[in-house]
Amino acid sequence: MEFDPAKINTSSIDHVTILQYIDEPNDIRLTVCIIRNINNITYYINITKINTHLANQFRAWKKRIAGRDYITNLSRDTGIQQSKLTETIRNCQKNRNIYGLYIHYNLVINVVIDWITDVIVQSILRGLVNWYIANNTYTPNNTTTISELDIIKILDKYEDVYRVSKEKECGICYEVVYSKRLENDRYFGLLDSCNHIFCITCINIWHKTRRETGASDNCPICRTRFRNITMSKFYKLVN
């Protein structure tokens, strides 16, 4: 059975997008709740609403060696702290349609989806997630800087921090971060120890090289030791 975008109903509550896939002739109803994180432009998917057993399976899996290793590598590759790869919305009257455990979409597509025994539901879930991301991802021309209009579409209140961010250069490659050729490189890698500016690609390469050589994780400029790298669309974290 092929995924059919025409069968998707969308709605939203606060900052959560609700996708309902309804295929009555085949008795299929699937609800997927997605949070789009503003700072690093990534997606968190509610696995509780997909199947209540998935959340318990995930909590057990992440305690095992394979789970711990996967999450460690994902945190390193994305620049997102391990504790921020999951989010929880608590069950209450206001949140009854969106409560549950939300996890980074990479964990859903590459791990959790394999725990679903119904191959049709697997296929539809994959289609829903890919459809949502494809329709909610900004794709500015690779030869130009990211446009101010794209950022303003995220949230108007970020206009001031964007205005500063668009002038910032990476302290390693000395390129303006928003002017880098590839879209995936147009993110900042924020250190928890200082305010020096780096693009996410350069600081991740620096971090990986230091680890491989057994050196400590120090800022390339001030040499202050850091513990975490946070991937962000802006030069500093914003609430």
UniProtKB/Swiss-Prot annotation:
<keyword id="KW-0945">Host-virus interaction</keyword>
<dbReference type="InterPro" id="IPR017880">
    <property type="entry name" value="KilA_N"/>
</dbReference>
<comment type="function">
    <text>RING-finger E3 ubiquitin ligase which catalyzes the formation of both 'Lys-48'- and 'Lys-63'-linked polyubiquitin chains. Plays an important role in virulence by acting as an anti-apoptotic factor.</text>
</comment>
<keyword id="KW-1035">Host cytoplasm</keyword>
<dbReference type="InterPro" id="IPR001841">
    <property type="entry name" value="Znf_RING"/>
</dbReference>
<dbReference type="GO" id="GO:0008270">
    <property type="term" value="F:zinc ion binding"/>
</dbReference>
<dbReference type="GO" id="GO:0016881">
    <property type="term" value="F:acid-amino acid ligase activity"/>
</dbReference>
<keyword id="KW-0808">Transferase</keyword>
<keyword id="KW-0862">Zinc</keyword>
<dbReference type="InterPro" id="IPR013083">
    <property type="entry name" value="Znf_RING/FYVE/PHD"/>
</dbReference>
<dbReference type="InterPro" id="IPR017907">
    <property type="entry name" value="Znf_RING_CS"/>
</dbReference>
<keyword id="KW-1130">Modulation of host ubiquitin pathway by virus</keyword>
<keyword id="KW-0833">Ubl conjugation pathway</keyword>
<dbReference type="GO" id="GO:0061630">
    <property type="term" value="F:ubiquitin protein ligase activity"/>
</dbReference>
<dbReference type="InterPro" id="IPR016398">
    <property type="entry name" value="E3_ubiquitin-prot_ligase_p28"/>
</dbReference>
<feature type="zinc finger region" description="RING-type">
    <location>
        <begin position="170"/>
        <end position="223"/>
    </location>
</feature>
<dbReference type="Pfam" id="PF04383">
    <property type="entry name" value="KilA-N"/>
</dbReference>
<dbReference type="Pfam" id="PF13639">
    <property type="entry name" value="zf-RING_2"/>
</dbReference>
<feature type="domain" description="KilA-N">
    <location>
        <begin position="21"/>
        <end position="131"/>
    </location>
</feature>
<comment type="similarity">
    <text>Belongs to the orthopoxvirus OPG021 family.</text>
</comment>
<keyword id="KW-0863">Zinc-finger</keyword>
<keyword id="KW-1128">Modulation of host ubiquitin pathway by viral E3 ligase</keyword>
<dbReference type="InterPro" id="IPR045072">
    <property type="entry name" value="MKRN-like"/>
</dbReference>
<dbReference type="InterPro" id="IPR018004">
    <property type="entry name" value="KilA/APSES_HTH"/>
</dbReference>
<dbReference type="GO" id="GO:0039648">
    <property type="term" value="P:symbiont-mediated perturbation of host ubiquitin-like protein modification"/>
</dbReference>
<keyword id="KW-1119">Modulation of host cell apoptosis by virus</keyword>
<dbReference type="GO" id="GO:0000209">
    <property type="term" value="P:protein polyubiquitination"/>
</dbReference>
<dbReference type="GO" id="GO:0052150">
    <property type="term" value="P:symbiont-mediated perturbation of host apoptosis"/>
</dbReference>
<protein>
    <recommendedName>
        <fullName>Host range factor p28</fullName>
        <ecNumber>2.3.2.27</ecNumber>
    </recommendedName>
</protein>
<dbReference type="GO" id="GO:0030430">
    <property type="term" value="C:host cell cytoplasm"/>
</dbReference>
<keyword id="KW-0479">Metal-binding</keyword>
